[in-house]
Amino acid sequence: MDKSKRTFLKSKRSFRRRLPPIQSGDRIDYKNMSLISRFISEQGKILSRRVNRLTLKQQRLITIAIKQARILSLLPFLNNEKQFERTESTTRTPSLRARKR
């Protein structure tokens, strides 16, 4: 076989189709928090259609539902829940206070 013809041969690997993220019975609604929370990042941002693997219509409905939930304060606009903990290096010790006086 020629090299030029060999490049166009397809490999016969098995292809597993992914399940759709939204089933036919799921209702896209601002009250359905379990469904909506799957399409929001850790920072509270709406994930893109490419990441979600949604259709255009589904992405539009998800976006509207997320925005409605934010307005009704069911979802936060930003998710900045950082735990600020003092480490030993940042805490002041009594010996440091005594020296400054």
From Swiss-Prot:
GO terms for biological process: translation. SUPFAM superfamilies: Ribosomal protein S18 (SSF46911). Keywords: Chloroplast, Plastid, Ribonucleoprotein, Ribosomal protein, RNA-binding, rRNA-binding. The keyword rRNA-binding applies. PROSITE patterns: RIBOSOMAL_S18 (PS00057). GO terms for cellular component: chloroplast; ribonucleoprotein complex; ribosome. It is found in: Plastid, Chloroplast. GO terms for molecular function: rRNA binding; structural constituent of ribosome. Gene3D superfamilies: Ribosomal protein S18. It comes from the Eukaryota. Belongs to the bacterial ribosomal protein bS18 family. Part of the 30S ribosomal subunit. HAMAP family: Ribosomal_bS18. This is Small ribosomal subunit protein bS18c.
